[in-house]
Amino acid sequence: IEKMMKSLVGQLNEPLPETLSPALLAEHHLMPLTDALMNIHFPSGPDVLRKAEYRLKFEELFYVQLNILRYAKDRQRKYRGYVFEKVGDIFNGFYSRNLPFELTNAQKRVLKEIRRDLGAGRQMNRLLQGDVGSGKTLVALMSMLIALDNGYQACMMAPTEILANQHYETIRELLYGMDVRVELLTGSIKGKRREAILSGLLTGDVQILIGTHAVIEDTVNFASLGLVVIDEQHRFGVAQRARLWTKSVQPPHVLVMTATPIPRTLAM
């Protein structure tokens, strides 16, 4: 293999076309591509080998990041979003009367970013990461209240009935005394109660729906779904998450919550 590589490298009579701009090479002190390829195989010393490795690793990650940015820009142009122009009585009433504690600086910052996204005219696709107990559910609820203030419904999907019930009870308690209809939909809810929930979704009487995979069934339809919150997103398939998009005339805003993000989700 060494003889073969020496033979191949020896055939490089001219420098290879550079794949990075001169400005980028200078800014990051990168080795030219031809030198990097030669020194990765036959380095004159450990320092030269490290520089060659760094150059090739840098280029690979640079183009990965560039493609992610390009995908994000294309996605913003492709998917228009509902414009939530106002923060109204529901949000303000909750903030002034029901907020259980003062928001942390991180929660305030995230809410500000979410409000900006919701009013930008493009579909929000935001990942909300925080440790267990950091207040992600409260941020998600306040985001859903913005949807309600603008005449839209909101839906939260959790991977298990236990977690869905937990969110349901927490949100009902947080909204105590407010005129907001919240319902729970799981596979174990059947009969007249299920029919009443499905009917309320179609009329818009059910403003917030919390549930499991049951919320993506074909029989579940909304009057005006504006925001989807997905908890523990890594436990859902991509196709399962995407099915919620079909529940609205145009794709609803998406807020994904997790304590343990995975690379695939970050790329999305």
Listing of model-derived features with the role each one plays in the protein:
Residues 1-98:
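Upstream accessory/linker segments immediately N-terminal to the RecA-like ATPase cores of bacterial MutS
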Residues 79-129:
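Conserved pre-motif I regulatory segment
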Residues 119-128, 138, 151-154, 206, ...:
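Pre-Walker A (Motif I) flank of P-loop NTPase domains
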Residues 125, 139-168, 176-181:
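Conserved SF1/SF2 helicase motif Ia
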Residues 163-200:
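Conserved helix-turn-beta segment of the N-terminal RecA-like "Helicase ATP-binding" lobe
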Residues 188-209, 216-225:
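Conserved motor-coupling elements within RecA-like helicase/translocase cores
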Residues 212-213, 231-232:
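Walker B catalytic acidic pair
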Residues 222, 226-227, 233-268:
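Post-DEXD/H (motif II) to motif III coupling segment of the RecA-like Helicase ATP-binding lobe
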